[in-house]
Curated annotation (Swiss-Prot):
Lipidation (S-geranylgeranyl cysteine): 204
GO BP term, pick one: cell-substrate junction organization
Family listed: Belongs to the small GTPase superfamily. Rab family.
Lineage, top ranks: Eukaryota, Metazoa, Chordata, Craniata, Vertebrata
EC number: 3.6.5.2
Modified residues (Phosphoserine): 180
Residue list for modification Phosphothreonine: 72
Lineage top rank: taxon: Eukaryota
Protein name (Swiss-Prot/TrEMBL): Ras-related protein Rab-8B
One Pfam family in the UniProt entry: Ras
Length: 207
């Protein structure tokens, strides 16, 4: 059977339990919102294929449990991720403070050039806000990461967040392929995973 996509990108949603990772995933993958989701047990993923610059991108989006007791399960999936969304709840100060801990986990376990984005979720609940948008923006700037406030309930910025992350990954892939070709490699390239956690995730190999 012919392949129905040009690229496969593996993405992770990480953050504390209850920040809305599963709701974001369902809003993007199925355009659905459900307030009765129970806390995610282990890890699950959804698929959605999008189009960017004439290319079909298959997004495999993993929803990882935020509770401390599942952290080892989450860690096993960092190495395969090409993009990671760090999610906090704007009505929960602690979930925002813990973003720094999640970033340290990424730095320890993920590839050095994985694309990252911080999402301040539940922005529809502005009357219960504990974390200002400015604080979220400042944290993102400090780490050199893009930032958006989102709402799975109202669908605010959900599409934009996933499309932005996918575009950043695609831009990086294209740049690396161009660098390989300009270095005299020539011919088609295949993107493969580099298992070393402190080196680039992306390697270009001649087919």
């Amino acid at each position: 059977m012919a392949k129905t996509y040009d690229y496969l990108f593996k993405l992770l949603l990480i953050g504390d339990s209850g920040v809305g990772k599963t709701c974001l995933l369902f809003r993007f993958s199925e355009d659905a919102f459900n307030t009765t989701f129970i806390s995610t047990i282990g890890i699950d993923f959804k698929i959605r294929t999008i189009e960017l610059d004439g290319k079909k991108i298959k997004l495999q989006i993993w929803d990882t449990a935020g509770q401390e007791r599942f952290r080892t399960i989450t860690t096993a999936y960092y190495r395969g991720a090409m993009g990671i969304m760090l999610v906090y709840d704007i009505t929960n100060e602690k979930s925002f403070d813990n973003i720094k801990n999640w970033i340290r986990n990424i730095e320890e376990h993920a590839s050095s050039d994985v694309e990252r984005m911080i999402l301040g979720n539940k922005c529809d609940m502005n009357d219960k806000r504990q974390v200002s948008k400015e604080r979220g923006e400042k944290l993102a700037i400090d780490y050199g990461i893009k930032f958006l406030e989102t709402s799975a309930k109202s669908s605010t910025n959900v599409e934009e967040a996933f499309f932005t992350l996918a575009r950043d990954i695609m831009t990086k892939l294209n740049r690396k392929m161009n660098d390989s070709n300009s270095a005299g490699a020539g011919g088609p390239v295949k993107i493969t995973e580099n298992r070393s956690k402190k080196t680039s995730f992306f390697r270009c190999l001649l087919l």
